[in-house]
Curated annotation (Swiss-Prot):
Residues 22-67 form a coiled coil. The gene is pan. Keywords: ATP-binding, Chaperone, Coiled coil, Cytoplasm, Nucleotide-binding, Proteasome. InterPro entries: 26S_Proteasome_ATPase, AAA+_ATPase, AAA_lid_3, ATPase_AAA_core, ATPase_AAA_CS, NA-bd_OB-fold, Nucleotidase_PAN, P-loop_NTPase. It comes from Methanococcus maripaludis (strain C5 / ATCC BAA-1333). Belongs to the AAA ATPase family. The lineage of its organism: Archaea, Methanobacteriati, Methanobacteriota, Methanomada group, Methanococci. This is Proteasome-activating nucleotidase. It holds the Pfam family Prot_ATP_ID_OB_C.
């Protein structure tokens, strides 16, 4: 059987088209495979780069771990630009070289440095040492008490503002008049009259740093510890300048010096002498203000009371009737009162200080809660005053020296 020539030609053409289609399909598959391999290669390259980076980081960490520790030392003297005398932490003194990475201007007597173990060369200068106890005395969060929250102490608030707040906020006023701003104020008076409250209000009203110290914290067991802590507190205050240092219960460390031979008294006297030197010594105190509080001014050492250390001594006395009324208004502002005459309460609450009046308000509220009432009436305040007065008389003890002091 024979086929036409045209039919044979079509078969040959179809075979060629099929072959060409297969070749194109193979090429497309190969190109797709190449593309996948290229993408995979890029992913592997990125992973390789990431692994190399991690490897470098781990190598650097290992190198740091392999570096031997450095020896701590203190500069005693600088001989020239590249040599210094150092007292090492191991004991002996050495004449050592300075590393090229160390600035010679940083090498001053007393500076802390790091020494290489083998050559003892100075390789790093450390920042000044700070006592963690002094650092902990700085108040980061300001108290939420303002002068408006203090009643019956208008004259005292004015005096403390003039001494502490005004020099920090408007120093140009003192420059125009030509006087040096006061440096410190001593608050004294019976317990509960608001001495610590005034210091909290000063911390709230000013933007200065605030360092709070209790006098007993400066009294330490071992020789020199208390004096060192005093130095560190004032050093911290100068670094944080403008700053206010509040020393509560200062009589714990600033009592009159005697001829006592006990070791504890001698250490307290050393701490006091360091405090006197820091308050008004050879070095300027800078923009650092001091507020101190005590309820025993009669036992304070005369040296600490002189001007230059405490330029103003403010008595926080017992509030009068108007003062007690102001205090009661502050403490009863959010209380649900019904038929209460605060003037009458202030009149019958004689010889009570601010802390007593706050306790009276709390007790009056407790009486209302006990009787399942949602408001406080006048009888609650009368019962509260009777309770607080009776508690004070029961816990009182004779202190004849205070009678003269507070009148």
């Amino acid at each position: 059987m024979s086929y036409p020539d045209d039919y044979s030609t079509d078969i040959e053409k179809n075979k060629m088209d099929l072959k060409e289609f297969k070749e194109k399909t193979q090429i497309a598959e190969l190109e797709s495979k190449v593309l996948r391999l290229e993408l995979k290669n890029k992913d592997i390259s990125r992973e390789n780069v990431q692994i190399k980076k991690e490897n470098e980081i781990l190598k650097r960490e290992l190198d740091k771990l392999r570096i031997p520790p450095l020896i701590l030392g203190t500069i005693l003297d600088r001989v020239n630009e590249r040599k210094a005398v150092v007292k090492s932490s191991t004991g002996p003194n050495f004449l050592v070289n300075l590393s090229q990475f160390v600035d010679p201007d940083d090498i001053v007597p007393g500076a802390r440095v790091c020494l290489n173990q083998q050559t003892l060369a100075i390789v790093e200068v450390l920042p000044k040492e700070k006592d963690y106890r002094a650092m902990a005395m700085e108040i980061e969060e300001k108290p939420d008490i303002s002068f408006e929250d203090i009643g019956g102490l208008n004259n005292q608030i004015r005096d403390i503002k003039e001494v502490v707040e005004l020099p920090l906020k408007n120093p140009e006023l003192f420059e125009k008049v030509g006087i040096v701003p006061p440096k410190g104020v001593l608050l004294y008076g019976p317990p509960g009259t608001g001495k610590t409250l005034l210091a909290k209000a000063v911390a709230y009203e000013t933007n200065a740093s605030f360092v709070r110290v209790v006098g007993s914290e400066l009294v330490k067991k071992f020789i020199g510890e208390g004096a060192k802590l005093v130095r560190d507190v004032f050093k911290l205050a100068k670094e944080k300048s403008p700053c206010i240092i509040f020393i509560d219960e200062i009589d714990a460390v600033a009592s009159k010096r005697t001829e006592s031979l006990t070791g504890g008294d001698r250490e307290v006297q050393r701490t006091l002498m360091q405090l006197l030197a820091e308050m008004d010594g050879f070095d300027s105190r800078g923009d650092v203000k001091i507020i101190a509080a005590t309820n025993r001014p009669d036992i304070l050492d005369p040296a600490i009371l002189r001007p230059g250390r405490f330029d103003r001594i403010i008595e926080i006395s017992m509030p009068d009737e108007d003062g007690r009324l102001d205090i009661l208004k502050i403490h009863t502002e959010k209380m649900n009162l019904k038929g209460v005459d605060l003037r009458e309460v202030a009149k019958i609450a004689e010889n009570m200080v601010g802390a007593d009046l706050k306790a009276v308000c709390t007790e009056a509220g407790m009486f209302a809660i006990r009787e399942e009432r949602e408001f406080i009436k006048m009888d609650d305040f009368r019962e509260a005053i009777t309770k607080i007065t009776g508690k004070k008389e029961k816990c009182s003890y004779d202190m004849p020296q205070l009678t003269v002091m507070y009148g």
